[in-house]
């Protein structure tokens, strides 16, 4: 499915199924609305899938991995080589997202869309667009065509997972320097001051943070991304990982799959996807409130509330893996609770 085909495939939620789901929720043995946001989650899943009893047993977290040329400006406390190392470590099973996803009965899908290394690791899907983006302090991160190619990579990966019966997606990433590119993209798309968006990432000093803010400001001045054109923003100050995750969100909406935001980087991709196609928002669920300040600004801009507030800033899809437990609980309660008829109890009626 091409970028244009995906955009044209995104439709509104199935309102009829959502109404039926609400009717069932109101008939479960509990006070009306007493499961709070769990009820909203189930209704959203019903609207996305068109199924009155949605299934979320086949879960995958897609991790897009890429390097960023801006790292040469000293915006990260980690060397660029960490991107390649962690990308390969995902397949060894001992990273944070590995552990958390195992406990939520989810698998990870690792995609190399731009790691600056020749990765020969069984299990890493090679969709390398280029070995890292260009330095945004010297010009655009990528060409417009490369940005679209990265987006289409995300769409492609989601389509293949849909064919395999996956029914719940999480999003994750790995890329040294990607909080810098995310801050740049998000600040342009939202219109916020850079200082409100930028955090310390993987552990910058205060001096490093000040440098990071200046680098982002200068990169935006140099490249002049168009806030009304999300693809232009991704191409000029983004990264291959962000663009590919943007494709994951668009692809999920096109294939009618529920998809979860992880932290700041994937929230930036979700923001870009929604700016491209506003209806995409209906298919997206937030997971946790990242400790990165820009994440809160994105959640506010999208009018979303994270399910979990744990001060995490790991990335990788770790927050999505944790929030899968909430989704499982919501679906289990909805599917397995008895009705008032089962319990021979008079149904609650709304108070006037």
Curated annotation (Swiss-Prot):
Example of a GO biological process term: cobalamin biosynthetic process
Annotated keywords: Cobalamin biosynthesis, Glycosyltransferase, Transferase
Catalytic residues (positions): 316
Top-level taxonomy: Bacteria, Bacillati, Bacillota, Clostridia, Eubacteriales
Family per similarity comment: Belongs to the CobT family.
Database matches in InterPro entries: Nict_dMeBzImd_PRibTrfase, Nict_dMeBzImd_PRibTrfase_bact, Nict_dMeBzImd_PRibTrfase_N, Nict_dMeBzImd_PRibTrfase_sf
Protein name per its UniProtKB record: Nicotinate-nucleotide--dimethylbenzimidazole phosphoribosyltransferase
Function: Catalyzes the synthesis of alpha-ribazole-5'-phosphate from nicotinate mononucleotide (NAMN) and 5,6-dimethylbenzimidazole (DMB).
EC nos: 2.4.2.21
Gene (name only): cobT
Pathway, per record: Nucleoside biosynthesis; alpha-ribazole biosynthesis; alpha-ribazole from 5,6-dimethylbenzimidazole: step 1/2
GO MF term list: nicotinate-nucleotide-dimethylbenzimidazole phosphoribosyltransferase activity
Recorded catalytic activity of this chain's protein: 5,6-dimethylbenzimidazole + nicotinate beta-D-ribonucleotide = alpha-ribazole 5'-phosphate + nicotinate + H(+)
Any single Pfam family the record assigns to this protein: DBI_PRT
Residue stretches in coiled coil: none
Catalytic EC class: transferase
Organism this protein belongs to: Ruminiclostridium cellulolyticum (strain ATCC 35319 / DSM 5812 / JCM 6584 / H10)
């Amino acid at each position: 499915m091409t970028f244009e085909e995906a955009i044209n495939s995104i439709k509104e939620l199935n309102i009829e199924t959502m109404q039926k789901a609400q009717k069932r929720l109101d008939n479960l043995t509990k006070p009306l609305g007493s499961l709070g946001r769990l009820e909203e989650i189930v209704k959203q899943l019903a609207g996305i899938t068109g199924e009155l009893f949605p299934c979320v047993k086949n879960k995958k977290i897609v991790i897009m991995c890429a390097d960023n040329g801006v790292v040469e400006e000293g915006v990260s406390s980690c060397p660029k080589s960490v991107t390649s190392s962690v990308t390969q470590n995902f397949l060894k099973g001992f990273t944070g997202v590995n552990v958390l996803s195992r406990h939520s009965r989810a698998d990870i899908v690792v995609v190399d869309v731009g790691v600056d290394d020749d990765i020969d690791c069984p299990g890493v899907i090679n969709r390398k667009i280029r070995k890292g983006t260009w330095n945004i302090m010297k010009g655009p991160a990528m060409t417009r065509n490369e940005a679209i190619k990265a987006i289409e990579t995300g769409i492609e990966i989601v389509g293949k997972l849909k064919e395999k019966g996956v029914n719940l997606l999480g999003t994750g990433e790995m890329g040294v320097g990607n909080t810098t590119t995310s801050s740049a993209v998000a600040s342009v798309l939202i219109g916020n001051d850079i200082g409100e968006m930028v955090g310390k990432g993987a552990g910058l000093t205060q001096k490093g943070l000040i440098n990071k803010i200046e680098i982002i400001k200068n990169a935006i001045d140099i490249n002049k991304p168009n806030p009304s054109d999300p693809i232009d923003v991704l191409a000029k100050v983004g990264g291959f990982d962000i663009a590919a995750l943007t494709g994951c969100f668009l692809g999920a909406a096109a294939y009618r799959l529920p998809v979860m935001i992880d932290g700041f980087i994937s929230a930036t991709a979700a923001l870009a996807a929604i700016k491209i196609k506003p209806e995409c928002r209906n298919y997206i669920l937030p997971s946790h409130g990242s400790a990165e300040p820009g994440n809160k600004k994105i959640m506010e801009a999208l009018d979303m509330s994270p399910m979990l507030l744990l001060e995490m800033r790991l990335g990788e899809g770790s927050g999505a893996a944790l929030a899968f437990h909430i989704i499982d609980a919501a679906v289990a309660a909805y599917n397995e609770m008895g009705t008032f008829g089962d319990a021979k109890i008079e149904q609650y009626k709304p108070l006037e």
